[in-house]
């Protein structure tokens, strides 16, 4: 089952809608926060609502938190692992690649209670053939120093603010990005073309590549999946961001 987020307020979860969707066959809820592609994050009220659902239904949770260290404006990441009840029911997934700029290494981890972890390993052994041992040793040594990941929010927030300020001087309308290194932008003042078509136009005619948000929907081509939104990635050198902004000013 799916429980669509609400775009007003900004991509928030309607927890009553989630609760209403849970039936007798529901075993697990999957969450992704900080959220790709919207950049939305959870707050304490979300954890309160989720606790209430878990307490009532006993449903298990799979929480994709790979952007856990990329949250902005001084707000902490609201991890499910911070609440004992949620932690008892959760598989919390994260990524060394996102945290340490090593996405090509494909090294991540899962935190779960012993009983859940044992079940996960039964599946994992058939899904993953091998992970590079040298890279795991390198990460184990590097993560002993917390400074690199503690500095991530300020590092990426500066880039987020740079892109947002630049887009403000274009016909794009940047949306809030409280987490991740992605930002959505509304292009409805430019054209009403479908998102995939507009993304293709930007790449071919302006040399700036974006992702159509409709690509993340169950049926990307459906009219209800197109909201004139594209996703920018600001995990780039400042010079690259500035060059992109200059090109987008002419769109």
At which residue positions do the language-model features occur?
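PLP-dependent class I/II
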Residues: 1-251
